[in-house]
Structure formats: C-alpha cells, structure tokens
Amino acid sequence: MSERALLAAQGYLELGMVEEALSELASVSAKAHSDPDLIELRLHILMHGKRWNEALVAAEELLRISPHAVPGYIHGAFALHELGRTAEARDLLLKGPPLLRKDPTFHYNFGCYEAVLGNRDSALRSLRESFALDATYRDFAKRDPDLAAIRDALVN
C-alpha cells in the first residue's frame, strides 16, 4: 500500500475534503483495497461525508475481512441508524465481540438507539455505563437529538 496515498487521504479527511480523500485511496493498488486499515479509513471518510449507504458497505466489508474489528460494528451500526434502520443498528452492536462492551461508544450508541426505539430503561442503563467509562459522553448526551425524550432522566 502506498504510504503517501494513505497519508494524503488522512490529510484530506482532516481538512474535510471527502472527494479528494477518496480519490487518494482509489489510487492504491487493488490488493491494498482489502487491507483492514484502508477499509477503516475509507469508512471514516464516507461517514464524514455522510455517505451512509457507502459507509455501511465499507463497514460490512471490514467485518467480512476482520470479524472482530470493533469499528466495523460501531460505525456500521451508526450508518444503519443514520439510514433510519435503528433496530438493525442495535442488533448489529449486539452481535459484536465481547471486547466491544468495554468501549464507551458501544454503550452510548446503544443507549441512543434504545432511546429512539422507546426503550427508556435500557437506554438509561446503557448511557450511564458509557458515562462511567468516559465522562465526556455525558456532555454529548446534553445535545444529542436522539436523547431528547429521556434527557430529563439523564440529569442524575
């Protein structure tokens, strides 16, 4: 894989230049396109560009190649949620490896999905677990539109 192309793609991503970042990734050899790191970078770029269908395909590809890749579950679920497929997003998270449950993002996103699906108690449990693992998630929750229906219960 071309290190230059990878670095250029990362740089373009940091600048918010989605098309340029994807163009750099397209320039690497066909063999490199199955590299999990490259797929994960492409996934991040697609998510940044809010290209949810393509991001979901990249997440599925990452999980085929690397079935224990935590980002494949987290980002694949997020893409599903953004596509309005929140129940599928929740189910994808639940299919992840045990290591996933140590990640505060798992608990935060799961809590958001549960809140959207109307499962208040489960949402609150999961969100509180995310806060215990990483207190910065409490700040995210204050502004997250997915949590509007349960925001009052998140105060304590």
Model segments located where?
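TPR/TPR-like (Sel1-like) alpha-helical repeat modules
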Residues: 115-139
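Alpha-helical segment of the N-proximal tetratricopeptide repeat
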Residues: 1-48
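Register position in tetratricopeptide repeats
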Residues: 14-15, 48, 82, 116, ...
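Alpha-helical adaptor scaffolds
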Residues: 36-105
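"A position-specific structural signal for the A-helix of alpha-solenoid helical repeats
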Residues: 7, 41, 75, 109, ...
